[in-house]
Amino acid sequence: MRIVFAGTPEFAAEHLKALLDSPYEIVAVYTQPDRPAGRGQKLMPSAVKALAVAHDIPVFQPQTLRNADAQAELAALKPDLMVVVAYGLILPQVVLDIPRLGCINSHASLLPRWRGAAPIQRAVEAGDAESGVTVMRMEAGLDTGPMLLKVVTPISAEDTGGTLHDRLAEMGPPAVVQAIAGLADGSLQGEIQDDALATYAHKLNKDEARIDWTRPAVELERLIRAFNPWPVCHSMLDGESVKVLAANLSTGQGAPGEILSASKDGLVVACGDQALSLTRLQLPGGKALSFSDLFNSRREKFAAGKVLGQ
């Protein structure tokens, strides 16, 4: 079977690795154009491109798949199937129709819940009990196609956006290989999604990471986990932006953002409802540290009565 793979970040690269180890022929890889990255803003290849180049697979990086030249280029590859994972470009219907068996997508949620760009983080933020990967047939709508198979994992009270991402990146690739086998032998037909159950996972926005201490502590604790490792929740203290990487629910009352107490166990801050104990912080110019380490060296910065967010 001739497969074209389309994907961009590390999550997608894990899927490409599994396909390279499968019996199927990867005839080409599509990925986003190289982007400036790092302090020097050098053009850097995507994780998928780096892997493809290492395996001598032809790489295509069109700005769009909406023009006739790009579509003709894809058609010339004569793909039986296109596997799409976190690619980042919209595939118009004419592209979806090119492969003999169509296009399939590995999506990091239990569809139809959390269609869209940031399903992993939104599941943690919402306090969902479980997440997973759905392999589906692609159609013109956003993550709306018939579902071929699902794999499920519980979301623990300690999971972050990062830990859930890594777990799903391990679960998704074998599911895709299994789905391809089911398509090839005709055993997988697909289950229509119930649009009434659909929710949308909006793209992450850095502005969302600024902590609003008037919100309930339970919501903020989930947000802090969801936005770790990116974009990372933060709040102002003494005119500096302090990153908050971990927190636990606590008790206490005060003005939202007010420091209620500080000890080696954590920095207790009042919220709109209850309080949070901040247990891992990063000060400007420094590295992430447990609050017990910060408390030893910067005790005066975290005096009770100070207010975060100002």
Curated annotation (Swiss-Prot):
Protein name per Swiss-Prot or TrEMBL: Methionyl-tRNA formyltransferase
Positions of (6S)-5,6,7,8-tetrahydrofolate binding: S109, L110, L111, P112
Matching PANTHER family: METHIONYL-TRNA FORMYLTRANSFERASE (PTHR11138), METHIONYL-TRNA FORMYLTRANSFERASE, MITOCHONDRIAL (PTHR11138:SF5)
Catalytic activity: L-methionyl-tRNA(fMet) + (6R)-10-formyltetrahydrofolate = N-formyl-L-methionyl-tRNA(fMet) + (6S)-5,6,7,8-tetrahydrofolate + H(+)
Family to which this protein belongs: Belongs to the Fmt family.
CC per GO annotation: cytosol
Keywords per UniProt: Protein biosynthesis, Transferase
Functional description taken from the UniProt entry: Attaches a formyl group to the free amino group of methionyl-tRNA(fMet). The formyl group appears to play a dual role in the initiator identity of N-formylmethionyl-tRNA by promoting its recognition by IF2 and preventing the misappropriation of this tRNA by the elongation apparatus.
Native species: Pseudomonas putida (strain ATCC 700007 / DSM 6899 / JCM 31910 / BCRC 17059 / LMG 24140 / F1)
EC number: 2.1.2.9
GO MF annotation: an example: methionyl-tRNA formyltransferase activity
CDD domains: FMT_core_Met-tRNA-FMT_N (cd08646), Met_tRNA_FMT_C (cd08704)
InterPro entries on file: Fmt, Formyl_trans_C, Formyl_trans_C_sf, Formyl_transf_N, Formyl_transf_N_sf, Formyl_transferase-like_C_sf, GART_AS, Met-tRNA-FMT_C
First-level EC class: transferase
